[in-house]
């Protein structure tokens, strides 16, 4: 397949056309050029030749590596979930947050292709956006009676049913599902105590939620610096969080309840103007529509075109850390060891962090790795049955919210 890669191509053009080449850059010490931030700011203007010359890397040899990677690893995204019942035949089901589905799916698909070629191991996997399954799939999980109805490896996003007491008591306590390995935590994960001390759940990464202020809509109000600040009465009907169609994001509601109880939930509801998907929030800000403050994943904050209009606030008490969790059937750990090693390894972690999702790995370098995180806490997660608690929170929040 002709690639037409040459030294005058911009790095952005190469990665956009051939995303499977990202790891050629990373493994040759050029990972900083293909992070999410660099792809937005630097890569659209930096040519391949200039980047390689500045690091004394042979251009012809590097292009050969790029072309070899493209030939051996055509981009094939991991397929989605065909049906609820089909999950029992899967080695892995991934329910990923928006923003992570595509980079995870492509990287994992490339890994599976290499695994099959090298070791003859064929893995059945499906990757879905968590938002597509948030209501339907998690309700279905609550009807499952046997571990045989579930995939061998489950990767899921947010504070979901897998952390609820029914799943925990039925599948985790008896040892049917467990974590894979205890990862050494970097400073932000260690400070927030995000890793499970009981080693029953593996945290692959977290989706950090931040506050984005539309400076045109502040009306002389001071910018918030903590999560408690956005509950102040001055922000009445000024706040937009993820939600819509009778649903609001519990990754925001749960920490508010933990910190301030029902009074905090009432204050939050009074300040919410509307519930939107983060992509809709980006549109709203770019069109300078209503709303002064937006709670959204940091990934989406970087996609706002009118950066001059906004202030991204990483709160002093940390971005809200919404987890991406891995669980595996205990009986499958040895059989699926190559897959599990990849999922918790530094290679995938660098991709996740580069996409704006902090990882526990102390050896991974990215801007998000240095910023504080705010975690619900494992005592809170184990003491409370999250699905039941979410219902109780909604009883207070929903009648007061738009």
What spans do the regions from the language model cover?
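A bilobed periplasmic-binding-protein/Venus flytrap-type ligand-binding module shared by bacterial periplasmic
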Residues: 210-217, 321-334, 351-355, 361
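Extracellular/periplasmic juxtamembrane helices and adjacent flexible linkers that interface
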Residues: 85-87, 334, 342-402
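Compact, charge-rich alpha-helical regulatory domains located at protein termini
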Residues: 1-66
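Periplasmic-binding protein-like
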Residues: 193, 266-275, 307-330
């Amino acid at each position: 397949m002709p690639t037409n890669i040459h030294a005058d191509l911009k790095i952005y053009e190469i990665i956009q056309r051939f995303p499977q080449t990202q790891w050629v850059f990373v493994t040759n010490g050029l990972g900083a050029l293909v992070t999410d931030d660099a792809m937005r700011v630097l890569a659209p203007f930096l040519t391949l030749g200039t980047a390689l010359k500045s690091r004394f890397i042979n251009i012809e040899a590097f292009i050969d590596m790029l072309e070899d990677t493209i030939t051996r690893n055509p981009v094939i995204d991991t397929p989605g979930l065909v049906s609820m019942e089909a999950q029992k035949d899967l080695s892995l089901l991934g329910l990923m947050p928006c923003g992570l589905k595509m980079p995870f799916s492509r990287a994992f698909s490339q890994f599976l292709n290499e695994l099959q070629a090298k070791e003859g191991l064929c893995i059945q996997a499906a990757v879905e956006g968590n938002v597509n399954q948030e209501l339907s799939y998690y309700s279905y999980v609550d009807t499952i009676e046997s571990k045989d109805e579930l995939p061998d490896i489950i990767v899921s996003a947010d504070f979901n049913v897998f952390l609820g007491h029914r799943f925990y008591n039925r599948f985790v306590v008896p040892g049917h599902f467990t974590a894979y390995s205890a990862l050494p935590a970097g400073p932000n994960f260690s400070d927030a105590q995000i890793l499970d001390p009981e080693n029953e759940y593996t945290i692959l990464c977290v989706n950090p939620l931040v506050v984005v202020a539309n400076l045109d809509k502040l009306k002389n109000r001071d910018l918030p610096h903590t999560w408690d600040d956005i509950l102040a009465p001055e922000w009445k009907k000024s706040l937009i969080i993820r939600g819509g169609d009778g649903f609001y994001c519990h990754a925001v509601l749960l920490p508010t309840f933990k910190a301030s109880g029902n009074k905090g939930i009432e204050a939050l509801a009074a300040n919410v103007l509307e519930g939107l998907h983060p992509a809709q929030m980006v549109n709203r800000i770019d069109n300078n529509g209503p709303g002064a403050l937006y709670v959204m994943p940091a990934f989406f904050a970087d996609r706002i075109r009118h950066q001059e209009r906004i202030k991204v606030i990483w709160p002093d008490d940390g971005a809200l850390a919404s987890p991406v969790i891995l669980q595996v059937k205990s009986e499958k750990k040895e059989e699926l060891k190559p897959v599990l090693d990849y999922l918790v390894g530094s290679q995938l972690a660098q991709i996740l962090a580069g996409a704006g999702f902090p990882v526990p790995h102390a050896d991974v370098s990215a801007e998000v790795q240095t910023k504080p995180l705010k975690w619900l806490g494992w005592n809170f997660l184990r003491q409370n049955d999250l699905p039941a608690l979410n219902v109780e929170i909604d009883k207070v929040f929903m009648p007061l919210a738009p």
